[in-house]
Amino acid sequence: MVCPAKWKNLVLFAGSLAFYFYGVRKTPVYLILFLISLLLNWYLGAWMVQAADEKHRKQRLFAGVLFNLCPLMVFKYSGFFTGRGLLLPLGISFYTFQMIGWLVDLYRREIRVFPSFLHFGTWASMWPHMSSGPILRWKDTETDLGARRVTASDVEEGLRELTIGLAMKVLLANQLSGLWQKVGAIGYESISTPFAWLGLIAFTFQIYFDFYGYSLMAVGLGRLLGFHLPENFHYPYMACSMTEFWRRWHMTLGSWFRDYVYIPLGGSRCSRWKLLRNLLVVWLLTGIWHGAGWNFLLWGGCLFVMIAAEKFLYLKILNRYPWLGHLYMMILIPLSWLPFAVAEI
């Protein structure tokens, strides 16, 4: 806030790299991996923009997407097949999707002016969102990167969001997590049905306050730095259907899958069987993005079944009678988190 305007991006970039180094201090080689990712993605973007024709643009986009997915597959999913997981680099799931989105937006010519490496690096490494999102796109911060000024209202709003987010995490999420841990300590086969439901409801609110708290802190910190980061949650537990829920929960992830996977596959403007295929692909990918385990794959499959059933059978009824939708979601939301919460499958 007191830094001269011409130095703001350089100072933020250096500070973000220092933050990343602190986060991976036990395995500092991960900082080198992250720097390589920054450099090569910036170069890949320039390489693709300079392509002579559409065929070469597609080839270079494919190379860029493959380059970004390989480290994610090795670090996050190799343990799924070998049984021996690796320590994850900080934020790799988030910055991998951020980089892929950057390349696709360049390919689609949605980024009109190719940025300097300093602007790109500042955007890609911005420390408030690095560990838990939101997943940024270039358009989210393009204007702020070029010229930003922190006003009194920015400070007020940033501190408010930071405080609320911190309270959600410390006062609510951390306290609720203890109840679900007690369920696991007793053993799922030994607990009573009422206590199992109580534990599951506690987990339902714990994961909300935990993730929303982190996201709100990121938005607040971004505001204090002069950036207007996208909101990630919009009262998801007030949704009347699972379809609506996922438009309100982790919205930057949902919009990423919509724009870069679902719509390119054909979206909903296709035959019924292709629509089912598109939904299955998106929700299985959503599941395994959250973690490398059979429970996450099962969770993604359950979401597919729920949302496909709504689309083909009763979504119009839920939208017509909101009271019925709220009752339906009061039961379905805790049950939908069960495969996510129980890792031993």
Q: Language-model segments: which ranges?
A:
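Membrane-embedded transmembrane alpha-helical bundles that form the catalytic cores
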Residues: 1-345
